[in-house]
UniProtKB/Swiss-Prot annotation:
The lineage of its organism: Bacteria, Pseudomonadati, Pseudomonadota, Gammaproteobacteria, Enterobacterales. This is Peptide chain release factor 3. Transmembrane segments: none annotated. GO terms for molecular function: GTP binding; GTPase activity; guanosine tetraphosphate binding; translation release factor activity, codon nonspecific; translation release factor activity, codon specific. Belongs to the TRAFAC class translation factor GTPase superfamily. Classic translation factor GTPase family. PrfC subfamily.
């Protein structure tokens, strides 16, 4: 049954992801947001090997051991009567394409930047993916309570490298040991950091009338006034329309570890981030206000609960409403199913739900029939597009210590590849199994999970592959010639799509120049 308050439920939802480079403070920010949302009483920022304390969003065994976030966690909490759907992506240096794909399921991104380091490699790559969809970006420059680079220098770097126009919303008052707080340019309030006075903020009057010297000292007061005058003349004012188009990014400063500035971020997400947006299908645009249910699978996680050896499919709801016991069409396999046991998430914990709306992420039990990119509807035969696979960057040949377990190995690799942990390739000339990943740590994850979840001991050999490109060719004669001339470089992925595995960029360039009517693609639509 369709609720009459559907529009109201849409307006109450924000679905966003947090992305960053390793050690920028993303996990701490996630924990503090859950704290503000009253999901946890004390942020669990301490985590490490043998400590027994781990971040709420880190629930896989290898994550707890290493103190990093490998999988994408989905968390739901309420802040000021707004339902926040937070998709927490891995922040460590080596993550999987699952990290990239998660950005297709959100309506906004929060980018976290270390004030001492500025923009780093993984942030650049994630931003490239976010910009494919012109996703609105809010930026938080973290760790101002430590030695930092000049804020204007960081903003210049953001504008140059990320191609975003910066709009400072808050501005830091000094940094490191002298960090005093931030000035909120639009609220016209100075928020004090760990103030020794009985005040947490100062109004604009205090800022103007000279009494600020009492709190900051004469020299710092003069400096911050001059700096603010400069940035308010140089940078444009916030324009929500340009933000929603992915042209500008509002900038906030703070210290996640010091629990300073996180409430400003949450307030901005409520105020500026879009409520659930439309999605493009292969036939038409699907709007969240529509009565009929639609949703797509953007992630599959195997064995979240080792006791049950289950597989969970993560679905982003696009339109309509989920109600317990409803009948849906699994479009790819043309099968109707009854969904009576969907649930929401808090890291490793599941909460059974009776109802969910566009923007929400729900979990479905998967017995091997659901794949990434699958669409579920109430009968309409559509497929959501823009949920790609990304070409891996690192490759390994995997083989068994016990050759008799080849069947179990293939089963385990199929499941791990379907959830986006790694990609599996079968060369057309032999029976080897080649794995491809975005980051090197994913290979460790595969070995660990094969051992724990499938009782398989496997090892790797290096393989002479540096690039992979999917083949797209409508000319059968050209495709035949490619297979005949370059068969030793060709393989099939898990969906039987042909892919070229190049030993060098020079090799790939030569093959591409000799086969101009064949497309060599770095992404493949699911």
């Amino acid at each position: 049954m369709f609720d009459s308050n559907h529009e109201q439920e849409l307006s109450k939802r924000r679905t966003f992801a947090i992305i960053s480079h390793p050690d920028a403070g993303k996990t701490t920010i996630t924990e503090k947001m859950l704290f503000f949302g009253k999901v946890i009483r004390v942020p669990g920022t301490i985590k490490g090997r043998g400590s027994g304390k781990y971040a709420k969003s880190d629930w896989m065994n290898i994550e707890k051991e290493r103190g990093i976030s490998i999988t994408t966690s989905v968390m739901q909490f309420t802040y000021k009567n707004i339902l926040m759907n937070l998709l927490d992506t891995p922040g460590h240096q080596d993550f999987s394409e699952d990290t990239y794909r998660i950005l297709t399921a959100v309506d906004c991104c929060l980018v976290v930047i270390d004030a001492a380091k500025g923009i780093e490699e993984r942030t650049r790559k994630l931003m490239d993916v976010a910009r494919i969809h012109n996703t609105p970006i809010i930026t938080f420059i973290n760790k101002l309570d430590r030695d930092s680079r000049d804020p204007i220098e960081i903003l210049d770097e953001i504008e140059k490298e990320l191609k975003l126009h910066c709009i400072p919303i808050s501005w830091p008052i000094s940094c490191g040991k002298n960090f005093q707080g931030v000035y909120h340019i639009y609220d016209k309030i100075i928020h004090l950091y760990k103030s020794k006075f009985r005040k947490n903020f100062l109004t604009l009057d205090s800022f103007l009338d000279g009494s600020l010297n009492e709190y900051l000292g004469a020299d710092l007061s003069i400096h911050i006034r001059q700096e603010l005058e400069l940035i308010m003349n140089v940078y444009s004012k916030f324009n929500k329309e340009k933000f929603l188009k992915g042209i500008t990014t509002p900038i906030f400063f703070g210290s996640a570890l010091g629990n300073f500035g996180i409430d400003h971020l949450l307030d901005s997400l409520i105020k500026w981030a879009p409520s659930p947006l439309y999605r493009q299908s292969n036939k038409r645009i699907i709007k969240p206000q529509e009565r009929k249910f639609t949703g797509f699978i953007f992630k599959i996680q195997a064995n979240m609960d080792l006791k049950h050896r289950d597989r969970i499919a993560f679905m982003r709801i696009v339109s309509g409403q989920y109600t317990k016991g409803m009948k849906l069409t699994h479009v790819r396999i043309k099968k109707n199913i009854i969904i009576s046991d969907a649930f929401s998430f808090l890291a490793g914990e599941r909460i059974s739900i009776n109802k969910a709306y566009p923007g929400d992420v729900i979990g479905l039990h998967n017995h091997g029939t659901i794949k990434i990119g699958d669409t579920f509807t109430q009968g309409e035969e559509i497929k959501f597009i823009g949920i790609p696979s990304f070409a891996p960057e690192i490759f390994r040949l995997i083989y068994l210590k016990n050759p008799l377990k080849q069947k179990q190995l293939k089963k385990g690799l199929v499941q791990l590849s379907e959830e986006g942990t790694v990609q599996v390739f079968r060369p057309i000339l032999n029976n080897d199994l080649i794995l491809g990943a975005i980051g090197i740590l994913q290979f460790d994850v595969v070995i660990e999970r094969l051992r724990i979840e499938y009782n398989i001991d496997a090892v790797y050999k290096k393989v002479n592959i540096v690039l992979a490109r999917w083949i797209n060719c409508g000319n059968h004669h050209s495709l035949y010639n490619l297979k005949k001339s370059y068969s030793s470089y060709l393989a099939y992925d898990i969906s039987n799509s042909l892919i070229y595995l190049a030993p060098s960029s020079a090799n790939l360039n030569i093959v591409m120049s000799q086969n101009s009517d064949i497309s060599f693609n770095a992404t493949r639509e699911q």
